A protein has these predicted regions:
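Phosphate- and other anionic-substrate recognition elements at nucleic-acid/protein interfaces
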Residues: 1-128
Length: 131
């Protein structure tokens, strides 16, 4: 099974593409990293234009990698000046995935860290080591 994982944002959308072999169990040997990177939007453009960039680049990733499903990081609301823009970018991601008919599962950052490191409060450096 091929999975496209997405960490949405307006300035940067992180992504990773993995193949998972369900018959190999839960360890890292059951997963093969195919691609990962960041979709960066032009900060000089309007929010609407940046969302178009996200949708365009995400469509290209889907066409190239042909994932069976997608995983999108859940967003928690907190007081920040960019909260609305991030939520809007997340909406563009979900809309694009849905247009391609991809099943979507959502995980909190804590759930992702727990699965990677065994510690839901791990910092990003420790999480990267496990990736």
């Amino acid at each position: 099974m091929r999975i496209l994982g997405i960490d949405p944002g307006l300035a940067r959308v992180g992504y990773g593409v993995i193949d998972v072999d369900p018959s190999a169990g839960r360890g890292t040997e059951a997963q093969t990293m195919l691609d990962c990177g960041i979709i960066r939007t032009d900060p000089g453009r309007s929010e609407g234009q940046r969302m178009v960039e996200i949708a365009r680049d995400l469509r290209q990733l889907i066409r190239v990698w042909k994932p069976d499903m997608a995983s999108v990081e859940k967003f928690f609301f907190y007081r920040s000046s960019n909260t609305i823009a991030v939520v809007q970018a997340r909406g563009v991601v979900i809309m694009t995935l849905t247009r391609f008919g991809l099943p979507i599962v959502e995980f909190t950052p804590m759930q992702i860290k727990q699965a990677l490191t065994g510690n839901g409060h791990a910092d990003k450096d420790l999480s990267l080591i496990h990736i």
